[in-house]
Structure formats: structure tokens, C-alpha cells
């Protein structure tokens, strides 16, 4: 089997054709406790990262937004308020379990009039060219098998002048933070997953997938190669997370 035939699933090398199913099993397992675990793992800081993302989105009333890997709907909820009744937000997720949790939570909280729910693969988005004013993907790109293809798809469905937002775990810029983060990721996260979600292996994969994700400069270059311009990134919490932005010319 050649290098082109395999890809990483955490630290493991698996056939390209199998990664999607491996990732699906992880998110089928964690869907019900996903929001609780996010709060515990980040001590609530993920809400600040997402708020920063919204602030950088430039989304206004009447806009059309695609939230890829939208999961339980954190960003979708915020975009829904911004675009208002004249706008539209599409929450897309490849995982049916996550999509169902997101749909239920949003509808239970009175959202839905301007939201569509679509099960979709980021590598083959089921939307026409030039469909959206903004495309976001938060903590989802690292789980995609072919990240370059996914970025090309995001660029394709953006309207000219539209903005892509990629919020993802990245590489800490402070050596002390980096060392502490490693200890936390590989010790505390699996333990927390075992105690709260009865699933340590999925959270071990989370830690490994973060380490395998491209660093800030590499992801910026990948976005440029996908056809986006004005690409930049913002390091959050000493680079533990980075928000990358790019614009379609």
C-alpha cells in the first residue's frame, strides 16, 4: 500500500477509504455529551474562541452562511441571529448523530426559521458555485481526509468577496504552554472522556488528531493554494487555537 493510499487517523495510518468511517464512529460515540465535554475540556474558553470567530466574520443581516461540521450548532445559532429573517444559515455535518443533536437543540431553543440542516461531506459540498457570503468550519477540518479538496470546495461555494473562517486547534507559540498542553491533552482528556462520556479512546484520538493537524503557516498556504486571497490567522490562547480567514476574489 503506497503513501497515497493511506492517511492518518490520529497517530495511526489507515487506508484513505476507511478514515471517514473511523471518524464517524468517534462522533457517533461522543455526540450526546459533545457540548458538556467541550465546556469541561476548554474550561468554557471555546465560547470565547467562537465569539471571536463571529466578530471576524463580517456577516450582516440578509447574508447566506454555510457552517460546515456545524455539529451541535454553536456557530449556527450566532449566525442565525446575525443574518435575521431575510438571511439563511445552512448547518452541514457529515455525521448524522451530530446533525440530529444540533437540530434538536436549535429547535428546542426556538431557532430554525432561517436555518437549514444538511448532511454533507466537506470534500464534495452539494451546493452550486458562488452560493454563500460566508463559510465557516470550527474544529472540523482536522477530521477531514482530504483537507486540500475540502478547502477547494469551500472556496468554490463562496461568492466573490465572501469569507472563509477556519477555527481549529493549532500549534502553541509559547514553549511552556506547549509542554503543559501536551501533558493535559494526553493525560487529562482521555481520563475526562472515560469519566464523563465513558469513552477514553475517542478523546485520545482528539489529542492525536490535533497534533497531526497542519500548523498555522502551513494551513495559511493551503488556503492560498485553494484559491483564497488575503489569508491571515489569529493565534488564540497562545496558539492553542488559531482562526484562519481568507477571501474569495
Curated annotation (Swiss-Prot):
EC number: 2.1.1.163, 2.1.1.201
Keyword Methyltransferase on entry: yes
Catalysed reactions, semicolon-separated: a 2-demethylmenaquinol + S-adenosyl-L-methionine = a menaquinol + S-adenosyl-L-homocysteine + H(+); a 2-methoxy-6-(all-trans-polyprenyl)benzene-1,4-diol + S-adenosyl-L-methionine = a 5-methoxy-2-methyl-3-(all-trans-polyprenyl)benzene-1,4-diol + S-adenosyl-L-homocysteine + H(+)
List of residues binding S-adenosyl-L-methionine: 72, 93, 121-122
Enzyme class, broadest EC rank: transferase
Keyword list, A-Z: Menaquinone biosynthesis, Methyltransferase, S-adenosyl-L-methionine, Transferase, Ubiquinone biosynthesis
Recorded GO MF terms: 2-methoxy-6-polyprenyl-1,4-benzoquinol methyltransferase activity; demethylmenaquinone methyltransferase activity
Pathway named in the protein's UniProt entry: Quinol/quinone metabolism; menaquinone biosynthesis; menaquinol from 1,4-dihydroxy-2-naphthoate: step 2/2; Cofactor biosynthesis; ubiquinone biosynthesis
Any one biological process term the GO annotation gives: menaquinone biosynthetic process
Protein family membership: Belongs to the class I-like SAM-binding methyltransferase superfamily. MenG/UbiE family.
Free-text function comment from the UniProt entry: Methyltransferase required for the conversion of demethylmenaquinol (DMKH2) to menaquinol (MKH2) and the conversion of 2-polyprenyl-6-methoxy-1,4-benzoquinol (DDMQH2) to 2-polyprenyl-3-methyl-6-methoxy-1,4-benzoquinol (DMQH2).
Name recorded for this polypeptide: Ubiquinone/menaquinone biosynthesis C-methyltransferase UbiE
Source organism of this protein record: Hahella chejuensis (strain KCTC 2396)
Upper classification of the organism: Bacteria, Pseudomonadati, Pseudomonadota, Gammaproteobacteria, Oceanospirillales
Gene: ubiE
Amino acid at each position: 500500500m503506497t503513501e497515497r493510499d493511506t492517511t492518518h487517523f490520529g497517530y495511526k495510518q489507515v487506508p484513505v477509504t476507511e478514515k471517514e468511517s473511523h471518524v464517524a464512529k468517534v462522533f457517533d460515540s461522543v455526540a450526546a455529551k459533545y457540548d458538556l465535554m467541550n465546556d469541561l475540556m476548554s474550561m468554557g474558553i471555546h465560547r470565547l474562541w467562537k465569539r471571536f470567530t463571529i466578530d471576524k466574520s463580517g456577516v450582516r443581516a440578509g447574508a447566506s452562511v454555510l457552517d460546515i461540521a456545524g455539529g451541535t450548532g454553536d456557530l449556527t445559532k450566532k449566525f442565525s441571529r446575525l443574518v435575521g429573517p431575510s438571511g439563511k444559515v445552512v448547518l452541514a455535518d457529515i455525521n448524522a448523530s451530530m446533525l440530529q443533536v444540533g437540530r434538536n437543540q436549535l429547535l428546542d431553543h426556538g431557532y430554525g426559521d432561517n436555518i437549514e440542516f444538511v448532511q454533507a461531506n466537506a470534500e464534495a459540498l452539494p451546493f452550486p458555485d458562488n452560493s454563500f457570503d460566508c463559510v465557516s468550519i470550527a474544529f472540523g477540518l482536522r477530521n477531514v481526509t482530504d483537507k486540500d479538496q475540502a478547502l477547494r470546495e469551500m472556496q468554490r461555494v463562496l461568492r466573490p468577496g465572501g469569507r472563509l473562517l477556519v477555527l481549529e486547534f493549532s500549534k502553541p507559540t509559547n514553549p511552556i504552554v506547549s509542554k503543559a498542553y501536551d501533558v493535559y491533552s494526553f493525560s487529562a482528556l482521555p481520563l475526562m472522556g472515560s469519566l464523563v462520556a465513558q469513552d477514553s479512546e475517542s478523546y485520545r484520538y482528539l489529542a492525536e488528531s490535533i497534533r497531526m493537524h497542519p500548523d498555522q503557516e502551513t494551513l495559511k498556504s493551503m488556503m492560498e493554494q485553494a484559491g483564497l486571497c488575503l489569508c491571515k490567522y489569529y493565534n488564540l490562547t497562545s496558539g492553542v487555537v488559531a482562526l484562519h480567514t481568507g477571501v474569495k476574489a
